[in-house]
Amino acid sequence: KIGVFLDGAFVDVTHLDPGEDLSLGHLPQGQVDGVLLAGSGDWDTGIAEMLRTRSKGGVTEIKHGDPHPLTTEVEHPGSLGTDRVANAFALQSEMIQGLEQSKVWMIVDVGTCVTTDVVCDGLHLGGSISPGLSMRINAMRDGTAALPGVEKEVWTKLAPFKGETIGKTTQEAIIKGAADGISAEIIGRWEILNEQFRDEEVVGVILTGGDSSLLELGRVMPKFADSNLTLKGYYAIFSHIQLSSNI
């Protein structure tokens, strides 16, 4: 996923298919002022070398375990995944609008895993990690003798998962069990947080991640979705690094 920012504003995004290699054709035309290459996994050194050919300011790399500017209460800040850091730092840096609706926010990133991160008055408190939709559906296939696999192309066509929660076929039951389970998990966490922060304000929810649009959270309010939240957080981290290096 490639995000482009101009004068601090998000202007464009390019999505790569799973397994698709990054190439110069995915990048904006001409030279850019700087590049941030970030992620929790490893990548070939040739990627950074390729990006340097299009960047006036070189390439900054951030990997899992690297120091980061997020203000957090977790015991081991370096153990946080880079996407979780970016999501929370987007809020700390006020990279998104609408945060005035609450002092307490739960960020829900629905991808390979479902991560939640709680930010209160700009401080990251921690969160949770659980299996994502594909992982849940595949686990039912791999862990049983009779349940079938369901390809992502099939269950995404049934999205969003609203209304009827009863599957009429085994395939529907698997999909609804996985999807409704995630929705119920998120709603349940939201209710627990509202009890925990009952002396503050109603907890807000920000949805992001590739599968976030497939869920139905019903009565959860305030809530909004930002599919580019992680990119905005990475940009905020990049700006912080650039500013710190110029001091």
Features from the language model and the residues they span:
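N-terminal glycine/serine-rich phosphate-binding loop of ATP-dependent small-molecule kinases
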Residues: 1-68, 201
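Short glycine-rich, Thr/Ser-proximal phosphate-binding strand/loop in the N-terminal lobe
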Residues: 1-31, 123-146, 160, 164
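Gly/Thr-rich phosphate-binding beta-strand-loop-beta motif of the actin/hexokinase/Hsp70
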Residues: 1-11, 91, 101-124, 140, ...
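Adenine-nucleotide phosphate-binding core of ATP-dependent small-molecule kinases
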Residues: 14, 159-203, 222-223
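Glycine-rich phosphate-binding loops at beta-strand->alpha-helix junctions
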Residues: 37-46, 197, 201-222
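Glycine/small-residue-rich loop that forms an oxyanion/phosphate-binding "nest" at active or ligand-binding sites
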Residues: 51-93
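Conserved phosphate-binding/catalytic loops in two-lobed NTP-binding clefts
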Residues: 56-70, 219-235, 243-247
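Glycine-rich phosphate-binding loop plus the immediately following alpha-helix
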Residues: 86-101, 125-175, 237-243
